[in-house]
A protein has these predicted regions:
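N-terminal beta-loop-helix "entrance" segment that forms/cooperates
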Residues: 73-86
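Feature marks short, surface-exposed loop/turn motifs that line or immediately flank catalytic pockets
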Residues: 73-76, 109-111, 238-240
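Amide-donor transfer/coupling interface in amidating biosynthetic enzymes
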Residues: 1-71, 89, 95, 99, ...
């Protein structure tokens, strides 16, 4: 089954050209299937790029998936046209009485700020609190994962002297967990961040399980025992050239930035980068939709039970 998105969403045409199975609302209704309802809080400045990246991965499933995009009301984007936001995004007040099978909270390039200094932090806390009663399983990505771990479990972030930037080798630590079913024992994932996690605080937290980690980049995939809260410290949704664009953007702006590790052949930015994480990016989201959303969510979302810690 396909991903259900508005026909005029920019990602629709791009994904169709890639032969990704997407469907507009009118066609989906004719199938008489209850789609999985996925809410995406898009905190990235590059809204359309992130929409396309996540839609691409969510569409790689036999399940019918309907996406709702969410924006913060307390912070307005300056990188995306207001017309786009008005056409495709809702605010928390508009959806707070709805329930969803799953949710994705994206990252944001604001690791240098204390959480309480983020202008939409209070609103984000209300949204994360909302997920505990109104969403079955929530994936938190990169900064969204750091913020979620801090809000739900008090895990502090650690500022890095050098940006964790590149594609790093990871190993699966709990191969029996359904979220990493089918993963190779060693796999690659991209990172692009100025902050990490306090490993001692994670180990001291009895509610969290590390499912995959890197000797260089640290814990990459964490989950609660129930799988209702998942934290991805990285960017498996990134496409082939995302790190390339970030690197060349920062070089052009004169910012201190190293060549992304393990990305360009022979570390030569003039050469085409290696795309080594695509399969596991798809597999992560397919496993999430199948094992933690589809198989466990009640057909009638009004019967959704609140999260118990």
């Amino acid at each position: 089954m396909p991903l259900i998105i508005p026909k005029n969403l920019p990602a629709y045409d791009e994904l169709q050209q890639e032969n990704v199975f997407v469907m507009h609302q009118e066609r989906a209704m004719s199938q008489h299937i209850r789609p999985l309802r996925i809410l995406i809080l898009n905190l990235m400045p590059t809204k359309i790029v992130t929409e396309t990246q996540l839609a691409r991965l969510l569409a790689n499933s036999p399940l019918q998936v309907q996406v709702t995009f969410l924006q913060t009301a307390t912070h307005s984007t300056t990188h995306t046209a207001p017309e786009h936001m008005k056409a495709f995004y809702k605010t928390f007040d508009e959806i707070r009485n709805e329930r969803f099978d799953g949710m994705i909270i994206t990252g944001a390039p604001i690791e240098d700020l204390d959480y309480e200094a983020v202008d939409y932090w209070d609103e984000l806390c209300r949204i994360m609190d909302y997920t505990k009663e109104n969403v079955y399983s929530t994936i938190h990505l990169c900064w969204g994962a750091l913020a979620g771990l801090y809000y739900h479990f008090g895990i502090p972030k650690v500022h890095l002297d050098k940006k964790m930037f590149g594609v790093f080798e990871h190993h699966v630590t709990r191969p029996s967990n359904p979220l990493v079913r089918g993963f190779d024992e060693v796999f690659y994932a991209p990172h692009s961040r100025w902050a990490g996690l306090d490993r001692a605080a994670i180990d001291a937290c009895g509610d969290l399980r590390i499912l995959a980690e890197s000797d260089t980049a640290g814990p990459m995939l964490l989950s609660t025992e129930s799988g209702r809260q998942i934290f991805v410290i990285g960017h498996p949704e990134y496409d082939k050239y995302t790190l390339d664009k970030e690197y060349k953007r920062d070089v052009k702006a004169g910012k201190p930035i190293n060549i992304p590790c393990n990305y360009y052949p022979e570390d030569d930015p003039a050469r085409d980068p290696l795309f080594r994480w695509r399969a596991h990016g798809y597999l992560l989201y397919t496993n999430w939709l199948n094992y933690y959303v589809y198989q466990d969510t009640p057909y009638d979302l009004t019967h959704l039970e609140a999260l118990e810690k």
